[in-house]
Amino acid sequence: QWPSSAASDVYKRQKLNFDVRKIFAPEHGFRGTEPNGANINDEIDIKTGLKIVSLHGKDRKYGEIDDYDLNEIDILIFDIQDVGVRFYTHISTLHYVMEASARNNIPLIVMDRPNPNAHYVDGPVLDLENQSFVGMHEVPIVYGLTIGEYATMINNEGWLDNNMKSNLTIIELKNYNRKVTYDLPILPSPNLPNRKSINLYPSLCLFEGTNVSAGRGTEMQFQIYGSPFLNKEKNNFRFIPKKNSGSKYPKHENLLCFGKNLSENKKLDKFDLSFLLNAYSDTNDKQNFFNNYFDKLAGTNSLKNQILSGLSERKIIQSWKKKLD
């Protein structure tokens, strides 16, 4: 049994007289309630009295721990629920935490958790020219590893700066089976509200690099897609994105969008390129379909160029399958 949340785990450690000095919070904040991309300030946690150091604030490089924040730290513990997708930023935060651990010779304990997308590997492998906080390593979009396995890979592949090694300990999962579907004890972030959204996230997050909405600003985030520019005869699902707690500035806010509702299809639990290809085929605004963020999410310039050139889905998939074998 793993803790339901990092917050509850901190409270338990305090009651057991562990000397917890501070909390480092990734994107979405300590309790996972902040919207994506939000700059979060440092604060004092009301319940524990501990300082929360935001690793997603405007005054620091996302994910990085400053050395002075580790002056009184003997051991670092990394306990975050990941979803097993390259552009979900917790593995980038893990990379920087491991660098801070190695740089300051502080042991790091990673609490392993189930990966809800561990049952397969798929998608284009990142080219380092497109390296960013939404993709730091040469892995496919869906990489099939738990967070503990991923930490071990970072160390073993020499991906840390100057080939440093973190003094790493993994608290492993007992009796874990990646073929079994686990209901996560907590929501990973505000816009992944259920298992279907988590399974569709690898496919639909690519729309963040286009003029198509993936449902932010609705109650069906990453379970629907659409835009005002899609052919409404072929895309008969309607929705209007509105500002909410999970999305302060949703794409196409207050505009009627035409698209597809994927929430009821139980078979959609793997990466599927057809949603993106169909949306591009159905758009009335091909010239502005892609934005500059797309290549960062895809991890390569090739995917966009293949779509623009009219390459078939089968041939596009074949082009990245070679690197996965």
What are these regions (language model features)?
Residues 10, 208-218, 225-230:
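Active-site loops and adjacent core secondary-structure elements that bind or stabilize anionic groups
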Residues 19-27, 111:
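Short internal beta-strands
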Residues 32-36, 109-131:
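Glycine-rich, charge-decorated loop segments at or immediately adjacent to ligand/cofactor-binding or catalytic sites
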